[in-house]
Amino acid sequence: MILIDFSNVALANVFALSREFSLAEDQKQFTKIFRHALLQTILSYKNKFSKVYGTDIVIAADGKGNWRKQEFPEYKASRAKARDQSGLNWDYVFAAMDTMKEEIRTLYPWPIIELPELEGDDVIAILVKRPAVASDAVTDFFAPAGDSGPAQRTLIISADGDMKQLHSKRVQQWSPMTRDFVSIKDGWTIYEKIAKGDSGDGVPNIYSDDDWFTKPQPSRAKAVSKKLISEVHQAITSGTVDKVFPADVARRIHRNINMVDMNHIPKRFHVPVLESLDKYELKGSKHLMMEHFMQLGASQLLARLDEF
């Protein structure tokens, strides 16, 4: 199975073709470029990886709202500022993404899973962690990856570093940014990410207050040592975080566990994700795609119709 993080792949295309997108005169032209780039990219993944990972493609998209932001309002709070500084027309970007999600639902042969409060990587994590034995699905979603993970080889298409914690013998990751497989450096564990936080998502390290990335700071954040990472690891695995660490640090450890550890995606989301895929009804067909591409004058996509 090939699991595609829709937003991640879509934005990789936008940044790679930023000059072409900047020349778009209106939304229609922008979406035309976006459609062509996205579909060509997905087909390239299918052609490149299907022999090893199979021809099943599932697309995971970000839903409205975000459960993490409800628990931690500063989560990804600085993203809007970064977008403003990019020079891109983000109204065009988001409109094109919405258009393509709807086209995937109605025209193309791939399931797209989008649920309220969930990010695409949440959907991917739940699908990857799904036990091979269906009867265990309700009670044991998050069995350790590896032999108790997915029965088939799975490729995650995403540049998101959070996906590293899903790697196993049968689960690999391909980055649309670097166009290469993602590897894990020796000694890396999820406990390092918990201790250090995730600057890209606005999650500070366990020494820093919640608003570290949203307010001017008088100095650099206090560094997190390997010794501290080891202590965090031991405290979490032994269930002694609140005993070992001062109250403020312990609270931040729990904050970061909830924000970055995919084993802590709330269980209320597990069944809806799995049922969304299991009960998904594909509406697309080659006939509908052919009519659509002819109407758009998308000759290059029309020529690749048999590859969908």
Feature map (PLM): residue ranges:
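Non-catalytic nucleic-acid-binding/docking modules located in mid-to-C-terminal regions
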Residues: 47-61, 78, 82, 88, ...
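Noncatalytic, basic helical substrate-engagement surface that gates or grips nucleic-acid strands
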Residues: 1-155, 168-181, 261, 267-279
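Short, polar loop motifs at secondary-structure junctions
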Residues: 158-163
